[in-house]
Amino acid sequence: MSEIALLFGKGLQVLGLFLSPILLVPLVSLAFPSLTQHFNKLKQSIDCLGKILMNIAGWSGFIMAAGMLIAVLMRYVFGLSFSWVKDIWIYAFATCFMFASAGALRTGGHVRVDIFYSKFSEKQRAIVDLIGAYLLLFPLMLLVLYAYGPQLARAWGALSGRMELSSQPDGLPLLFLFKTLVPIFAVTMILQGWANCMRAVAIIKNIPIEAAK
């Protein structure tokens, strides 16, 4: 399994190298607007991925609620408590949050201090979104990927040769997958942020760009 962990880590590094030049495409598109059309299909694919992640997040929310209900009934009605039941709703909650983040970014569903933004024109909003992505979103998500690397390596057993399965004897043996949600969250946020930037450039340059179906 340690070989799998190392391979997974190298895969993330390659992905990071691949994303670095791609992240510059929206900025280059400001000077060469025709690029927005060339990358339109990629943007649509990312938007579709955001929709899929939102659907997964919705089912995860249902599983979380059901898991919490089962845990309460087992504890206060039958006097039973199992770590794996608790793990179900904790893991489901984490999946719901991590997967829904990119989908919410696609639809503008994240909480923002909306004092001036709502009064801006569509083009002004696009400029704000573009600046915010490059000053805040991309640096923060890249920092998450970089800083979380050692923790992810330990979870997958790259250092000890054993994957982290559970902190409790009767817990779900999926702790390494649970911790993998963090880099998945960062990567999907970067991808969706990139798609939003391409959409913002199209708005700024008055270029019609087809939305994801």
Regions found by a protein language model. Name each.
Residues M1-K213:
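Alpha-helical transmembrane segments and membrane-interface helix-loop junctions
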